A protein has these predicted regions:
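Short, glycine/acidic-enriched capping/hinge loops at junctions between secondary-structure elements
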Residues: 16, 43-47, 74-76
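Short beta->alpha linker loops
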Residues: 7, 38, 104-107
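N-terminal glycine-/serine-/threonine-rich phosphate-binding loop
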Residues: 1-32
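Glycine-rich N-terminal segment of FAD-binding domains in flavoprotein oxidoreductases
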Residues: 26-53
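Short hydrophobic segments within beta-strands
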Residues: 6, 33-35, 64-66
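Ligand-binding beta-strand-loop-alpha-helix segment within the catalytic cores
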Residues: 56-120
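Generic structural signal for well-ordered alpha-helical scaffold segments
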Residues: 17-25, 48, 52, 85-89, ...
Length: 120
């Protein structure tokens, strides 16, 4: 494990973006794990800046959200699906049909979890 000490949130985003881009460099279909919350926002903001600058293209990428609330409508603005669409998919210009979020409103959550695991 490597510990990297950064001076501020912006530097955290830059360092993290550099690592992500090294991992996906040359991949025709990069696959990203997508978390919600405030921790990854600096990374997402820096990746969005680089997308806007033409330095990287995630339009063919695939995304998998880490989690979703149980029982929430996926169209609810507070759902993780909508959060991921707003904070990641739109700014990174990803195809929303290529981004998966666990189905927290499925009638059989165990089956939905297995299907999601298989998709990953």
């Amino acid at each position: 494990m490597e510990v990297v000490i950064c001076s501020d949130e912006q530097q955290v985003g830059q360092v993290a973006a550099n690592r992500v881009l090294r991992w996906v460099e040359g991949l025709a279909t990069p696959v990203l794990g997508l978390a919600t919350g405030s921790s990854p926002l600096a990374l997402y903001n820096e990746l969005a800046r680089r997308v806007a600058a033409g330095e990287v293209d995630f339009s063919c990428g695939i995304g998998f959200a880490l989690d979703e609330y149980v029982g929430i409508d996926p169209e609810n603005p507070l759902s993780y699906r909508q959060t991921i669409l707003r904070t990641v998919v739109e700014p990174l210009r990803m195809d929303p049909t290529r981004v998966r979020v666990p189905n927290g409103s499925a009638p059989d959550l165990a089956t939905a979890a297995l299907e999601y695991d298989r998709a990953i």
